[in-house]
A protein has these predicted regions:
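Juxtamembrane luminal stem/stalk of type II transmembrane Golgi/ER carbohydrate-processing enzymes
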Residues: 1-162, 167, 406-460
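Conserved beta-strand scaffold positions in the cores of enzyme catalytic domains, especially
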Residues: 186, 220-224, 290-292, 362
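Short, well-formed alpha-helical segments that are part of the catalytic scaffolds
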Residues: 168-181, 185, 195-207
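Conserved catalytic core of nucleotide-sugar-dependent glycosyltransferases
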Residues: 271-400, 406-407, 411, 415-416
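A short acidic (Asp/Glu
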Residues: 134, 171-175, 197-201, 273-282, ...
Length: 460
């Protein structure tokens, strides 16, 4: 009889994992649903209310998470290679003793009296969804299989964004402004060699030291790659893979106080994820990993919109990066997690079922991929710097390096092999035409937002 009762109890526990809790129950406690489904202890201590004090919901610190104070010029050079996260911070009280949670866009969600917690069902602003109006459209219309299990966190995750840079400084500036208040550390790798193996100046380091990026300097971890991998000149994919491997392993080793559930995202310099999606990953529990972003594709500028989306797996938690991908960014981007030897052990140790998903969809972009988006001089430099892997290597042909030829490619949207593409219509007023910082600084980035060589009908 006792054995029968035990079996019945075990079946009951198993059934819980398939139950969809009502929204009212899910909203009652951000940690209640996660305690049933994920079976993992919180990674940071929770702060108890003071005796006799009012209960409160905690306000996210995603816009107030500096890692280092800006450095004096005398110390800036020696500190480029170090970055330390502060100790754990629990989300703060709402001002004036009230209790409110914030929507992901910063608007208050609910408020209550002095002694009793009160939750109010939200009327969501356009672009936001869910019981607490914190789920952005790029998640609502994604293929995430666990949307009914999403709950706000009391302690935000830290977000690490890793990038290799060559000469994409305008796009890097856009990334810093677009994501600067939600990303906690930008790990940027620069080498004194191009991807082709030729010497190059350390331009990004120079810009860090001369103050060009002072507004974000406290969040930048500079990684210097001082060598070119053997065989990289003959096989460009060796160099391409090595850049991402070195970026990830060397960069992560220099970050202190990491937590297993911190978010790691590795991008190419011409890939910019949407802020709303990154903020969701920071503030919510219940999503699976690894994850990708559906990105709007464009060529030479945002004015040549290409069909479809770019969908590249580019993110996971720090725990998965280390346990499954051996802290190798190229494995994250190019290898299916279930082919990696550590994935089953990671599933068992965390209680998480690994299911790959993508933020956004082919109809709802979750970022931007702007390929060859430079001035003609920038495209020339990309041609001569490119790895010896994408064939034909157009930088080897003198006529393809001619600036007038490059200007004509930008004007027509053509490719180096002489082909022409059919482009969907692109309107600067469309929802995801370009990152907001670009649009707010239209004159400065006009060459990326309007075709500078388009011939106006009727013009002489």
């Amino acid at each position: 009889m006792a054995g029968l009762c035990l079996i019945s109890f075990l079946h009951f526990l198993k059934a819980l994992s398939y139950v969809t809790f009502p929204r009212e129950l899910a909203s009652l406690s951000p940690n209640l649903v996660s305690s049933f489904f994920w079976n993992n202890a919180p990674v940071t201590p929770q702060v108890s209310p003071e005796p006799g004090g009012a209960e409160f919901l905690r306000t996210p610190l995603y816009s107030h998470s500096p890692l280092l104070q800006p450095l004096s010029p005398s110390r800036a050079s020696e500190e480029l290679h170090k970055l330390e996260f502060p100790g754990t911070k629990v989300l703060e009280k709402a001002p004036a003793g009230g209790r409110q949670e914030e929507r992901a866009d910063g608007a208050p969600l609910s408020a209550g009296g002095a002694k009793r917690r009160k939750w109010v069902e939200c009327v969501c602003l356009p672009g936001w969804h869910g019981p607490s109006c914190g789920v952005p459209t790029v998640v609502q219309y994604s293929n995430l299989p666990t949307k009914d299990r999403l709950v706000p966190r009391e302690v935000p995750r830290r977000v690490i964004n890793a990038i290799n840079v060559n000469h994409e400084f305008d796009l890097l500036d856009v990334r810093f402004h677009e994501l600067g208040d939600v990303v906690d550390a930008f790990v940027v790798c620069e080498s004194n060699f191009t991807a082709y193996g030729e010497p190059r100046p350390l331009k990004f380091r120079e810009m860090l030291l001369n103050g060009s990026f002072d507004y974000i300097r406290h969040k930048v971890l500079y990684v210097f790659l001082d060598h070119f991998p053997p065989g990289g000149r003959q096989d460009g994919w060796i160099a391409d893979d090595y850049l991402r491997t070195f970026l990830t392993r060397d960069g992560v080793s220099r970050l202190r106080n990491l937590r297993p559930d911190d978010v790691f995202i590795i991008d190419d310099a011409d890939e910019i994820p949407a802020r709303d999606g990154v903020l969701f990953l920071k503030l919510y529990d219940g999503w699976t990993e690894p994850f990708a972003f559906h990105m709007r594709k464009s060529l030479y500028g945002f004015f040549w919109k290409q069909p479809g989306t770019l969908e590249v797996v580019s993110g996971c938690t720090m725990g998965m990066l280390q346990a499954v991908y051996a802290t190798d960014g190229i494995r994250l981007r190019r290898r299916d997690y279930y082919t990696m030897p550590g994935f089953r052990q990671y599933e068992n140790s965390t209680g998480h079922i690994l299911v790959q998903w993508s933020l956004g969809s082919p109809l709802h972009f979750a970022g931007w991929h702007c390929s060859w988006c430079f001035t003609p001089e920038g495209i020339y430099f990309k041609l001569v710097s490119a790895q010896n892997g994408d064939f034909p290597r157009w930088g080897d042909y003198e006529d393809k390096r001619d600036l007038n030829y490059i200007r004509e490619l930008i004007r027509t949207g053509g490719w180096f092999d002489g082909t022409m593409q059919e482009y969907p219509p692109a309107d600067p007023k469309e929802q995801m035409y370009a990152p907001k910082y670009l649009l707010k600084n239209y004159q400065r980035f006009r060459y990326l937002l309007e075709n500078p060589y388009r011939k106006v009908e009727g013009a002489g």
